[in-house]
Amino acid sequence: MDRWVLGFALAVSVVTSVVFGWAPALHASAKASEPLKKSGRGLTGAEEGTRLRSTLVVAEVAMSLILLAAAGLTLQSFVHLVGSNLGFNPDQVLTMRVLPPSSRYKTDEQGIAFSRQALSGIRSLPGVQAAGTVTFLPLSGWWGVRSVSLQGKSVPEDQRPIAPWNSVTPDYFRAMQIPLIKGRFFEERDDERAAPVAIIGQSLAKRLVPNADPLGKWLDVGGLKKPAEVVGVVGDVYQLGPTSQTIAGIYLPFSQVTAPILCFAIRTTEDPSGVAKAAQEAIWAVDKDQAVGFVMNMSQLASEAVAPQRILMQVLGLFGGMALLMAVIGVYGVIASSVAQRTNEIGVRMALGARSGDVLRLVMREGLALVLLGVAVGLAGILGLMRFVSSVLYGVRPTDPVTMVGAAFALAGSALLACYLPARRASRIDPMVALRYE
């Protein structure tokens, strides 16, 4: 999230809260300290002041509702994101990345030998269940594409559909727990001497052969001299996170299609951090000069993938809470001011037989009218503004009725509680004291 945008939003929210919340409350306090000193001559001015404060409170309630609804939507969105299926299991997976220098690994055979020896050493470590390598690790922010089409279709390569690709070793799918839909995973026999093979994701399979079995089909893949046979279909993996439409499409065996990047995925039976040092030493046992970087748990990457949504949720939650507090203060201030101005009227009503409950309901109705008007304006504002936040939501509609109703009830309930204090005070006024009140 851009820090300037965040700072600007914070400043606007604070200023808005102060203007719409504290201003009415402070004004009400001033009025309460010298009530109706100018009961005759100042009547028009008092009425204008009341209308202004009421208008400000209605605006505050409306803006508070919009912020509360936005906070509720982002909270639901974040919950959906955290629980979303990435296409693999990030728990208990250690990752690290190496870039074998071309000065020492001049041929494909040398790169293949390095990966096999390093993986063999890592798999022998206590607590390691499976280990494999991949070119572009999911959620790392790195990805690449290749053109891909069914063999026999006369489509120029620059016009073929493109799909994210990865070069992987056989145990990669087991290490990441990517589900096999049909066919098989890569095996050691799928080496540089064997016929080219490929595994494709479920979505790509539906695109290429929507009404047929993709197994056994041959694909023309960009960069490959020969067609590759589809030997397996796996579940979709969200390469850049659940909010992205970038889904891993085609997997090629590292033994047949090498790459200058090797990202290790190591599934462990215990805390992955506990085997990090030993895994690095297993790589250095093959090449003591090989730099090893990007050492972290896959669950940490998964957490970072939803970090922008987490920050947005926290910011809007903070702003929503501040706005709710200011709305409550504003409503309290206006009702307290109204009670102070109407002390004589209340005394007359009670002298003529009005009961405490009647006065309580009278004052509460005044507060309820302001709150309901603010809620109505806020709901109208939500319908007009929420479509602009749809791009940052996941798994929830911008106009989710449960969120709207929940925010409205939370705001209305809090505001009515703020009305109750001055209303109760008004219901306990002594009529004789109120009639002498000037």
How should each PLM-predicted stretch be described?
Residues 1-105, 393, 432-438:
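Alpha-helical transmembrane segments of integral membrane proteins
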